[in-house]
Amino acid sequence: MNEITIGIIGLFVLVAVFLTGFELGFAMALVGFVGYSLIISVKAGFGMVAQDVYDVFSTYGFTVIPVFVLMGQIAYNGGIARRLYDSAYRFLGHIPGGLAMATVGGATAFGSVTGSTTATSATFASVAIPEMDRYGYSRILSTGVVAASGTLGCLIPPSVPLIVYGIITEQSIGKLFLASVFPGLLVALFFMFIIYGWCSLNPSLGPKGERSSWKARIASLKEIAGVAIIFIVVMGGMMQGLFTPTEAGSVGAFAVAVLAFATRDINLKGIFKSLKESLVTACMVLILITGSAIFGHFIAVTKIPMVTADWIMQLPLHRHLILVLIGLIYLLGGSFIDDLAFMILATPIFYPIVVKLGYDLIWFGMFLHLTVMIGVIIPPVAVNVFVVRNITKESFGVIYKGVTPFLLSLALVVCLLFVFPQIALFLPSFLQR
């Protein structure tokens, strides 16, 4: 068999193994190792696996995942998350799906700190879903909105995949960050419209409560004043360059623990429980990333991406249709492989084609990011869905049903970006003249 045949078989085997209930990270690693070994050698396969495991677990950028998950777990076990959602309920509880909207807003802010889809999904699956359960929200809505809102971790700057894209294509990181602001906010806004419309049509998904008085709302703000200060310090420190994302997460986790101790909402047993749950979640996410890196190396040696690129360039199609084909490839890749791993794999292959077609690389960065983000929440694999499922133990069917409406809003933003490229290009051109 040639490399391409092995690669195609590998894709089908991955889906089959995954559907048996095998953990996704291990499934990708196993298929990637076997396929790589068949094409190169078993010795090379072991070497590749060892290198990828080392690279992922020694990469400083990934340390942001455990510290922010820990901050979320302490906030949840210490009752801080409960007070935050109680306050949000005072302001938004009378609106259909109000807490789900608050989750989208929180994920937008959180994504601006972490720049990670998996970290955002893991944190809000631990914190937001139990609170929405408490207020009688359907798991269809709560798990769906968390899995979909995880995409905001990649769209809102600073985004790690955007940094990688900028390095590969030699584009300005600052311009890429500016270009992502409006698309990211549009996605968040459309998510909120989806929630409102969906819950208005089916109130049982996100039942609205009684309208709270302004006195009750102000009183609830006093309960979260400490959390607000922590948020301002963490966000402000990040934006001013005082903290790296990991340092910001560490400061936040420590401050949240101190606040929980001070209010006597948590004890040492609760801290150890938070540490244990954070360790399990962080390891699960890092194993997913490691598995996708191993599988990505296997796909690279099959030459499937290069052959696909050559085939696309030979097609007698209009450049817009060729771009749509490239977008579909990114969408498919994002459904199988971690968004960052697929960016590293595919961008060096396709961006020269985009240059030849005459597209702006800053705009293309936004276009491919949105398509990859659709990929991380669609079957057959959907990394974000898997993260939420692993934490909540909810069925895949329920989560997939929940993310479907949000897929439509992501697709709409892609179409708008295609028709109106200034959505991405206005800020970079206006602020960096």
Model-identified regions with their sequence ranges:
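Alpha-helical transmembrane segments of multi-pass membrane transport proteins
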Residues: 1-433
